[in-house]
Amino acid sequence: MYKRQALIHSTTKFIGGHGTSIGGIIVDSGNFDWEAFPERQPALNSPDPSYGGAVWTEAVKPLGPIAYILKARTTILRDMGAAMSPFNAFMFIQGLETLALRMREHSANAEVIAKYLSEHDSVERVIYPSVMEGYAKDRADKYLTRGNGGLMGFEIKGGRESGEKFINALEMVYHVANIGDSRSLAIHPGSTTHSQLSEEELLSAGITPGFVRLSIGLEHTDDIIADFEQALSKI
């Protein structure tokens, strides 16, 4: 976890891997001292009126530093009702069995697609570690030692109009806002997920007019490239 004490992760993405289930997990390393800075963790170090005045850091001392995760499993779960269905849990557990295999393929495919896009005349730039330079690539090389994953972005020449045309011309790749699917997915955020933002807000979020986000799936790269090629030819 690279010294992270708690991790919140969407299992809907690569763990599920097939776009069939919705869920998330909280992972507590069990190593963080939740009592060290009580003023920064008041919910864990002061009486909880919703749970009989319990002070979570004191109540769990015999069990170790698990105040956060225990509170999450009692009061937060109780108040929010975030209870995963048994079938979804089964799908995620099943997905974990092939996660390592799929991630290797996602990463390998994405490397090929990133190289293809970076050499295409209709593409201004590609956002993917292997074709980038500087700080971002250095960090990726340090931490992503088993591959750079399947998520990438690219800036298409011609701005918003070209971005929309590209998306609408895709035949095999799905136009979906999800990521981490076995299928390749593409979306033009400026005209869909972030369309309510002003131009200034879009730019501050790193979303340029021709930006397209891709989640590269497990199809053969020849098929992915063929679909991108015919779509790019129509802008």
What are these regions (language model features)?
Residues M1-Y2:
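Short, small-residue-biased leader/transition segments that mark boundaries at the very start
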Residues A6:
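Short, Asp-centered acidic motifs that coordinate Mg2+ and/or phosphate
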Residues H9, I15-L151, E155-R183:
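Active-site C-terminal subdomain of aminotransferase-like
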Residues H9-S10, S215:
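Thr-Gly-centered strand-to-loop micro-motif
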Residues F14-I15, T221:
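Short strand->helix junction
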Residues R102, E161, N168, S184-I235:
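PLP-dependent enzyme catalytic core of the Aspartate aminotransferase-like
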